[in-house]
């Protein structure tokens, strides 16, 4: 998703849906200023992409996410891994920590994760 559409989805994921346009606008405008018409255009695009469902309540449209944040994250992560790192998890992790100090806790977390993957493969 483009950044502006992702911003709208983050509002929906991080709040209790369904939300109307004014509620979305109130949250999003704490970070950046978007006109109501821009928000409506972004919501229409998200509906066309089947990311949100629109239901009517009187004269008001309510927006509910159809794609969960975890599903989106998994899809995007896999896409980045494939396109930028040739499906190499090692290259991906190396690029994340290149030149940065890694805490013992992070090393342990990675080690535990790899052990879990190894156990699943058995």
State where each predicted segment sits.
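Conserved segment of winged-helix/HTH DNA-binding domains
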Residues: 68-93
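Glycine-centered, phosphate/nucleic-acid-interacting loop/turn motifs that mediate DNA/RNA or nucleotide
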Residues: 50
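Short acidic, hydrophobic short linear motifs in intrinsically disordered regions
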Residues: 18-28
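Short beta-strand "wing" residues that participate in macromolecule-binding interfaces
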Residues: 54
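Short, cationic-aromatic polyanion-contact patches
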Residues: 1-4, 57-76
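Pre-recognition alpha-helix immediately N-terminal to the DNA-recognition helix
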Residues: 6-11, 23
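Short, hydrophobic-biased segments on the C-terminal half of alpha helices
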Residues: 40-44
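C-terminal regulatory/oligomerization modules of transcriptional regulators
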Residues: 94, 98-122
